[in-house]
Amino acid sequence: MYEYSVLAAESGEDVNPLIPATYDIVWSVVCVAIIAVVFYKYVIPRLTKVLNERADKIEGGIAKAEAAQAEAQQTLEQYQQQLADARLEAARIREDARTQGQQILAQMRAEAQAESDRIVAAGHAQLEAQRQQILTELRSEVGRTAVDLAEKIIGQSVSDEAKQAASIERFLSELDSSDAGIGVGR
């Protein structure tokens, strides 16, 4: 500071230590202008380019994220649709199986009823055949017994077989009709 005072005393003017000399101001303005031109010409375009690239990447990332989200949403909807279709298919298969089971059950019941009816009919036919066989055997047995009893009662031989057979048949027919009227024997 002493130097400024000495210089100011020599020049004869009052020098303010806060205000620089004119040549310093000129050179400072020139340096600032050069730096501004360099910044404007080189630094700012590169900075703008980097910022634009970064913004593009961010926007591209956002677009990709939106596309991925839309694709994920579409995939989710397809999955839900497939799941709903699978549930409908499963319900249809269950219903088909239930219907088929009912048809099989009805068919088995019908077959069982037919088999039962066949067995009952065969049983009735067998019973009727046995009844007819027993009746035939009984008629001949009753006929012989009647002839034997008649011979014992009369004391002589009844030899006319045609008359014997006709008499026995008439007697048995009357017996059958009287049994049928009463409901006995059947």
UniProtKB/Swiss-Prot annotation:
The name this protein goes by in its record: ATP synthase subunit b
Natural source organism: Nocardia farcinica (strain IFM 10152)
GO molecular function: proton-transporting ATP synthase activity, rotational mechanism; proton-transporting ATPase activity, rotational mechanism
Record keyword Phosphoprotein present: no
Keyword hit for Plastid: no
Source superkingdom: Bacteria
One Pfam assignment: ATP-synt_B
NCBIfam families found in the cross-reference section: ATP_synt_b, PRK05759.1-3
Keywords, alphabetical: ATP synthesis, Cell membrane, CF(0), Hydrogen ion transport, Ion transport, Membrane, Transmembrane, Transmembrane helix, Transport
Assembly information from the UniProt record: F-type ATPases have 2 components, F(1) - the catalytic core - and F(0) - the membrane proton channel. F(1) has five subunits: alpha(3), beta(3), gamma(1), delta(1), epsilon(1). F(0) has three main subunits: a(1), b(2) and c(10-14). The alpha and beta chains form an alternating ring which encloses part of the gamma chain. F(1) is attached to F(0) by a central stalk formed by the gamma and epsilon chains, while a peripheral stalk is formed by the delta and b chains.
Main subcellular location of this protein, as a coarse class: membrane
Localization: Cell membrane
CDD domains per the UniProt record, alphabetical: ATP-synt_Fo_b
Function: F(1)F(0) ATP synthase produces ATP from ADP in the presence of a proton or sodium gradient. F-type ATPases consist of two structural domains, F(1) containing the extramembraneous catalytic core and F(0) containing the membrane proton channel, linked together by a central stalk and a peripheral stalk. During catalysis, ATP synthesis in the catalytic domain of F(1) is coupled via a rotary mechanism of the central stalk subunits to proton translocation.
